[in-house]
A protein has these predicted regions:
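A short coil-to-beta-strand element that immediately follows conserved catalytic motifs
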Residues: 108-117
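Nudix hydrolase/Nudix homology domain
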Residues: 41, 78, 90, 116-121, ...
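Conserved Nudix-box catalytic region and its N-terminal flanking loop in Nudix hydrolases
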Residues: 42-53, 63-100
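Acidic, metal-coordinating catalytic segment for phosphate/diphosphate chemistry
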Residues: 21-54, 60
Length: 193
């Protein structure tokens, strides 16, 4: 890992040939209490528990919007996952961050309801570790979607049954956290759709 400086003086990191900005997310304890700000890549390199969110957007036909992560992402690139997922920045509220990322990644905003949270840990194939306390939001939307190509390769609307069959048949095509979410919490999600 090499530290470089951007044109605006911001600190950037080069990791495995990719340049990443220094984003500070929220390290938490097992009860989701804030411990300290932590640089995002450092949290993933050290496997530190941190706050995250996953957004599930459904249309009027009860189809879920999936995104295929851009292959250049620092982890889990080219895999299918929930509509939107990210981390609140240090000093930013969860719901505020969820709305911000929905607009940045998919080009729209809608009402979001936080429905539950869960924790998981996964060692990724590139040596990074996801160790997250993940807050799940559900929203409804039927308008146009404008994916940010820096974040997303593709999108599609699918029925939940289709997702479950796809995960069972080809788990390697989906992110770990989305598989975990659908395998352990699908009933809670279905009740809210």
């Amino acid at each position: 890992m090499v530290c470089v400086f951007g044109a605006g003086g911001g600190k950037l990191l080069r990791f495995k040939g990719k340049i990443l900005s220094m984003e500070y997310i929220i390290q938490v304890d097992e009860n989701n209490r804030e411990i300290a700000p932590i640089e995002k890549l450092e949290a993933h390199r050290r496997g530190l528990l941190h706050r995250a969110f996953s957004i599930l957007i459904f249309n009027d036909q009860k189809q879920l919007l999936l995104q295929k992560r851009n292959g250049a992402k620092y982890h889990s690139g080219g895999l299918w996952t929930n509509s939107c997922c990210s981390h609140p920045n240090h000093g930013e509220g969860l719901k505020e961050a969820a709305h911000r990322r929905l607009q940045e990644e998919l080009g729209f905003d809608c009402e979001l309801e936080e429905v539950f949270s869960f924790s998981y840990r996964a060692e990724l194939d590139n040596g990074l570790v996801e160790n997250e306390h993940d807050h799940v939001f559900i929203g409804r939307y039927d308008g146009p979607v404008h994916p940010n190509k820096d974040e997303i390769e593709d999108i599609r609307w699918v029925n939940l049954e289709e997702v479950q069959v796809g995960i069972q048949a080809n788990p390697q095509q989906y992110t770990y956290w989305f598989r975990h979410l659908m395998q352990h919490y699908a009933d809670r999600i279905i009740q809210r759709v």
